[in-house]
């Protein structure tokens, strides 16, 4: 399993719901957790490894148990927002502050098919929102005006020998 990097079109795909949570899906989740940990990330969504599945994994910190989110749906967000510097494993080295709702209520299934509805706030809520965006083909840089987005991406694109806007 390998990471997919910007500007790969696989990062822009809206994922499909998972109909059967089976050993194949559990294996994907396990490998995604390993890749996320090796890469030093706190979240990883299926499109970031080239999978067209509504699946992401999260580990808020090195001491936390990894969480698997299958067919997730944010059903409520707080009216209170917070700003925090975000980055993305698929766009290494690019970081910038982004305003997001401070808390979310999310419905999902775990790797065993058990359904959960939980409320999260602060950093975990931010990670969940970031990974949910990936499942809809949205990257954190998409929230910025084109001029700022291009400025943030220019060094990244140049470093990879890609043409920047």
From Swiss-Prot:
One of its GO terms (biological process) is translation. Its EC number is 3.5.1.88. Keywords: Hydrolase, Iron, Metal-binding, Protein biosynthesis. It catalyses: N-terminal N-formyl-L-methionyl-[peptide] + H2O = N-terminal L-methionyl-[peptide] + formate. One of its GO terms (molecular function) is metal ion binding. It comes from the Bacteria. The keyword Protein biosynthesis applies. The active site is at 131. Pfam families: Pep_deformylase. Fe cation binds at residues 88, 130, 134. Its cofactor is Fe(2+). Binds 1 Fe(2+) ion. PANTHER family: PEPTIDE DEFORMYLASE (PTHR10458:SF22). Removes the formyl group from the N-terminal Met of newly synthesized proteins. Requires at least a dipeptide for an efficient rate of reaction. N-terminal L-methionine is a prerequisite for activity but the enzyme has broad specificity at other positions. Belongs to the polypeptide deformylase family. This is Peptide deformylase. The lineage of its organism: Bacteria, Pseudomonadati, Spirochaetota, Spirochaetia, Spirochaetales.
């Amino acid at each position: 399993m390998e990471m997919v990097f910007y500007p790969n079109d696989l990062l822009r795909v809206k994922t499909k719901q998972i109909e059967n949570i089976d050993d194949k899906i559990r294996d994907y989740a396990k490998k995604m957790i390993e890749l996320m940990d090796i890469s030093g990330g706190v979240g990883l969504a299926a499109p970031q490894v080239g999978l067209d599945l509504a699946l992401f994994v999260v580990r808020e910190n090195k001491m936390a148990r990894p969480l698997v989110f299958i067919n997730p749906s944010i059903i409520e967000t707080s009216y209170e927002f917070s700003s925090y510097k975000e980055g993305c494993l698929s766009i290494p080295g690019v970081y910038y502050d982004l305003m997001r709702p401070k808390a979310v209520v999310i419905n999902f299934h775990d790797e065993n098919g058990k359904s959960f509805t939980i409320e999260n706030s602060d950093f975990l809520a931010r990670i969940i929102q970031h990974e949910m965006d990936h499942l809809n083909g949205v990257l954190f840089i998409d929230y910025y005006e084109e001029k700022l987005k291009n400025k943030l991406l220019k060094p990244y694109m140049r470093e990879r020998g890609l043409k920047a806007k």
